[in-house]
Amino acid sequence: MIGEKDLAGDGECSRTKTSKPRFSNLNNQTHQDDKTGQYHQKGVDFLNVRSNNLDGGFSSKSSPRSGNELTLSYLCENSGKLAESLGQKGKEVVTFSENSSYDDKWVERDFFNLREMNPNSSKRKAHEEEEEAEEEEDKKSNKIETLNLSLALPDVSLSLTASNAVKRPRVVTSERTTTSFSNDFTATAPSMSYSYSHPFSHNISCSMTRNSTDFDCSVGKDDHIWCAGEGTNGSVHSRFRPIGDGGVALANNPVSGKPSSSADYSFFPSELPARPGNEVTISGDSRKKVANLEDNDAVRSERVLYDIVSKSISSVALIIQGMADETLESAKEYLRNLIDSPEKKEKLVNLQNQIDKRSDLSKETLSKCVKDQLDILVAVRTGLKYFLSGKIRIPMNELVEIFLFLRCRNVNCKSLLPVDDCECKICSNNKGFCSSCMCPVCLRFDSASNTCSWVGCDVCSHWCHAACGIQKNLIKPGHSLKGQRGTTEMMFHCIGCAHKSEMFGFVKDVFVCCAKNWGLETLIKELDCVRKVFRGSDDAKGKALHLKANEMVKKLESKQISPLDASNFIIQFFNYAESIPEIPDPPRELTVAAETSYRKDEASVTPSTSKDQKKKSFALTDAMMNSFDSLESMVRIKEAETRMFQKKADEARIEAESFKRMIEMKTEKMEEEYTEKLARLCLQETEERRRNKLEELKKLENSHCDYRNMKLRMEAEIAGLLKRMEVTRQQLV
């Protein structure tokens, strides 16, 4: 039964903590009193107040008919007859009986008949019928009394429909009264109530884990929103949820310290969904619990990854198919953290070692993997986390080939390995190395293109990071391949084929083709790379390019020049640099001769002890130093250079004549060999033709003989026939 008014006439709260009120049965419209139970109650107070402030302020004024009431009803009679006596709001006045003979019984709340207040809800009726059928089956199967863990008032009959309740002896217990508050935003006014804390029982009519009126855990499923106490079946405890120590706390209490979750909504009726309150403070125990939960998640994720990399493919595939999506996503997130965190590199290496130890990971077995399982295996082995994201879709067969190092792990390349069947030491010694997109020094790849930061070999097409080449001294001065003998230029020494590729022309081609499309930051990076490459250059072109790149970088950083103008200046410089003559290094002989002449001139100066002599000696020394740069010294240097070049020219002429003689000898020898081979070839062809003609002649002779023999035989046969014809004619005549 639901009390329609819970306040006294003067508007104040009716509160009795020490008295023992006795509740009588509800007087129904049919005036049927089957049985009456007297119930004992201690300290049950009903407070109905209106709140003008949601922040916790309460007033003593209330409206008896307002929708902000919290009403409680207790069942005394048959639950089937209760629905007929209820009004449209399901409320009746509670009457008290002073002379009831049953003091040891408490009335259990009616959690089912109130659902009849919305007869148009077919979904609610269907749920009620299903739950009632389940209750009947449970009662038939379980004849014993359930464990007393109920939220219902003490000493209540376990059956809602029992007409004769068995008396139980009164047990005097000291019960603690707890005050509970609610700031439920779905109700129109906050409420406050006093309730006892009783042991809980798994009673399906009032469960801590199930709502008493609706067994559907989804909040907001029903279409009717109940106000105040309506829709909660008069249950104060339906507004509460359990906490760790088994006590009762407000469901929306902001200082409870426990964050709301989807599981908490199962304690609220679907007609009156509760919003979780804002958390104000979090206790130290809660922080410890959160930390422990995070540690447990990490341990569980690590265990999942270890099972994936160590256990058989088929068993893990079955496990993953039955695994929750949250667990699998947590394992992937843990693996992403392993890849991103350098301090956790050892754990990632251990997982990779587990994979390397396995011998059953073939193409056939890996084809039986689940997609998520194969993604994790590939991500662990390659150390790349983008295989774990669902944005990149790679076919299963390509993932298997990437795992087995048969295909490039760069998703922008994915070339079959080795590229172009390369057999160099880099491609053969490094599994999974792709010469199209990976650096042979650091074995890494990136998506950079049309840039000077990647340097390529002219022969084997291996590409290397310019920074790696400078660090490993692969980009250094070398003898020029196109210029004069004795000149040097910056070269890239390929470690794959040991070929030398010149850098000046490569940088020029890149700037001419791509510089106009670069922005400010890109142009600064490219010029900085060029500056680093040509920093140790010895030739005039390289030094000039280094200075020009340094100048352009400073101007671009200070925004003295636009990127387009800077790129035009660099391109003009490359065109101008082609006309710069390559000056060879000064010959060692010339340097030695100059040093010797200077020492002789210096030795010819006689020292003097007087000041004048010293001044003269200093002046003479200065004159000697200046005379080294005079015209005579330049003439001597030029003469020495002329003699040196003449000597080299004579040597070159002699060498050229020797090469010419060798060529003539080789030519004569080749002509003789050619003539002999041609004659031999002609003789063989003639003999072959003669042999073919003889065979044809023999065939003709044989055919002629056969024809002659056949002709003679036919003539003989014809002559015999004529003779017989003549004889026959004579006989007839």
Curated annotation (Swiss-Prot):
Primary localization class, coarse: nucleus
Keywords, sorted A to Z: Coiled coil, Metal-binding, Nucleus, Transcription, Transcription regulation, Zinc, Zinc-finger
Gene Ontology annotations of biological process type: cell fate specification; embryonic meristem initiation; embryonic pattern specification; inorganic cation import across plasma membrane
GO CC annotations, alphabetized: nucleus
Gene ablation phenotype (knockout): No visible phenotype under normal growth conditions, but the double mutants tta1 and tta2 exhibit a rootless phenotype and seedling lethality. No visible phenotype under normal growth conditions, but the double mutants obe3-2 and obe4-2 exhibit broad growth defects and developmental arrest of seedlings.
GO MF, one annotated term: zinc ion binding
Ranges for region Disordered: 1-42, 118-142, 592-614
Cell compartment(s), UniProt: Nucleus
ZnF start-end (PHD-type): 436-500
Coiled-coil parts of chain: 120-153, 644-733
DNA repair is among the record's keywords: no
Polar residues bias: start-end ranges: 21-30
Domain of life from the UniProt record: Eukaryota
Comp. bias (Basic and acidic residues): 1-15
Family annotation (InterPro entries): OBE1-like_PHD, OBERON, Oberon-like_PHD, Oberon_cc
Subunit (UniProt): Self-interacts. Interacts with OBE1 and OBE2. Interacts with OBE4.
PANTHER family linked: PROTEIN OBERON 3, VERNALIZATION-INSENSITIVE PROTEIN 3
Annotated function: Probable transcription factor that functions redundantly with OBE4 in specification of the hypophysis and establishment of the embryonic root. Involved in the activation of ARF5/MP-dependent gene expression during embryonic root meristem initiation. Involved in shoot meristem homeostasis.
Stated name of the protein: Protein OBERON 3
Originating species: Arabidopsis thaliana
Source organism phylogeny: Eukaryota, Viridiplantae, Streptophyta, Embryophyta, Tracheophyta
